[in-house]
Amino acid sequence: MVAEGLCQCYIRRMSTGGPHGAAPDRSCLARDTEGRSPCKNCQGCTQGAADPIPIRILMADSDVEQAPSVSVLPRNKILILAPAGKAYQAEVIRDLFNIEASESDRIVRDVKWSNKYYEVDLDLYIDSYESLQTWGAEFCSDECADLRDVVAGIFLVFEETEDAETFQQLIEDCHFTDERVLVACDLSSAEHPASLERALEVHDVALVRWRERGTNELGEQQGRERVRELLDIHPWSERMLRMHASTAAALAELDPLQADIPLDSVVTRIKQARERYLEITDVHAADEYAARIAHELTEQLLPE
């Protein structure tokens, strides 16, 4: 796997800045078909199995190019991204996952995400940027296609509106074809134009004011609870999920007619309805539209 192409020397330098100096050499990725050869740049460390680091990888080695796709890895990686020199990621990780991440952490493995229905293991990737535009150009490049494939979600933690606007373009440039948990977590208290939220929603990016609580005028959760909700409803691969006993029993008793309803069509319908709702300027008309959509979905999901 390409993941094995990341030598332990490279992983150490990404995590600690040593032993070869503070600046990691991103080309330290050589491997042979056995996954155990010394890396060309270090000539001393050996390859070991490791998950991909969410930064640009130089695919210059022919055997790296010919290695099987990293997509065989589970898509359970959450990339948490923030400006360099800030500790924003630590706050989000603490509030959302109830764990402490140090400044030197780059990967936090086997983080359990659990609700009353299921449990799933996630890996957190922690990265930062000097320029989000430059970072995005690397991450969205063809060389990082396999890495993007294992990322289930990207959380941008920001204070500057310009970063949220750049994030919108970044997601567009990545051309994701499958659903991801995409969140722009705003730690500031500044007001953003409604056009920004709509522009992000076009690319399925949720704009979340991290420190807000409760629900908004649409009855939707805000702040960290909104992000928890997005993680809960994400369609994780069945082979990753561990259903709680009560959930498994309920699924076993589900009416086969209801079980045949494609969930993705329902989710798409809800997203389209939300976009249309936000475009309606008349409050009364918007409420009528919301009530009609709710009735239609109820008829579809719970037929008499």
From Swiss-Prot:
Superkingdom per UniProt: Eukaryota
Alphabetized UniProt keyword annotations: Chromosomal rearrangement
GO BP term, pick one: vesicle-mediated transport
Pfam families xref list: Adaptin_binding
Listed GO MF terms: protein-macromolecule adaptor activity
Gene3D superfamilies (UniProt xref): 3.40.50.11960
Keyword Nucleotidyltransferase: no
The keyword Acyltransferase appears for this protein: no
PANTHER family associated with the record: INCREASED RECOMBINATION CENTERS PROTEIN 6
Protein purpose: Involved in gross chromosomal rearrangements (GCRs) and telomere healing.
Family: Belongs to the IRC6 family.
Protein name per its UniProtKB record: Increased recombination centers protein 6
Natural source organism: Eremothecium gossypii (strain ATCC 10895 / CBS 109.51 / FGSC 9923 / NRRL Y-1056) (Yeast)
Name of the gene encoding the protein in the UniProt record: IRC6
